[in-house]
C-alpha cells in the first residue's frame, strides 16, 4: 500500500507526498528508499553560470523543503530551495531573471534556477569549499562570516579534516 501510494505520488510529480509516505513507512521499519530521494532535472547553467551537479541540488531541495513546492518556513523562506524573498529578489537581478514572489512557490523551475544560481555564487565566494557554501546557504553568509571571524568554523573545519584523514 505505501509503495503504491509513493509510486503514484511520484508519477504525478508530487514528490513531497512520496517522501512523506516513505518517511512514515520507514518509522515503522518498512523502507521504500527509492521514493525518499526523488529525481528531477535541474539546470546545468543559469544565464551562463555553471550550476553544481543535479544530485547536489536535489539534496539541497530534499533537506530544505522535502520537495514541497509550496513550503514556507517560519522565517519566511519559500519554495523548493527555501529562498528568502529579499535574497531571491537580489539573485533574480544578478541572474537577469524577472522577480516574482508568487513564482517562488508556484514554479519549480524558477525556484530551482534562483536557488541554484544563489548557491553557485556562494560556492564561488567561499573558494569552492562546499561545507562553507552549504552553511552560508542555510544560515546566511553574514552569519557564517561572523562565525569564521570568531574562529569557530576554523576549529570545526580542523576537526572535520583530522577525522577525514
PLM feature spans:
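Catalytic glycan-binding domains that act on GlcNAc-containing polysaccharides
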Residues: 1-165
Amino acid at each position: 500500500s505505501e509503495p503504491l501510494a509513493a509510486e503514484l505520488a511520484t508519477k504525478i510529480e508530487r514528490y513531497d507526498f512520496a517522501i512523506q509516505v516513505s518517511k512514515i513507512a520507514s518509522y515503522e521499519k518498512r523502507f521504500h528508499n527509492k521514493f525518499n530521494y526523488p529525481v528531477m532535472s535541474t539546470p546545468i547553467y543559469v544565464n551562463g553560470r555553471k550550476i553544481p551537479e543535479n544530485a547536489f541540488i536535489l539534496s539541497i531541495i530534499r533537506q530544505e523543503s522535502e520537495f514541497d513546492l509550496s513550503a514556507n518556513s517560519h522565517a519566511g523562506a519559500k519554495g523548493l530551495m527555501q529562498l528568502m524573498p529579499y535574497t531571491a529578489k537580489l539573485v533574480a537581478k544578478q541572474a537577469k531573471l524577472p522577480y516574482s514572489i508568487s513564482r517562488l512557490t508556484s514554479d519549480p523551475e524558477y525556484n530551482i534556477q534562483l536557488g541554484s544560481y544563489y548557491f553557485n555564487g556562494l560556492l564561488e565566494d567561499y573558494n569552492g569549499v562546499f561545507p562553507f557554501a552549504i552553511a552560508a546557504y542555510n544560515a546566511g553568509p553574514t552569519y557564517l562570516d561572523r562565525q569564521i571571524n570568531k574562529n569557530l568554523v576554523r576549529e570545526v573545519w580542523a576537526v572535520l579534516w583530522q577525522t577525514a584523514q
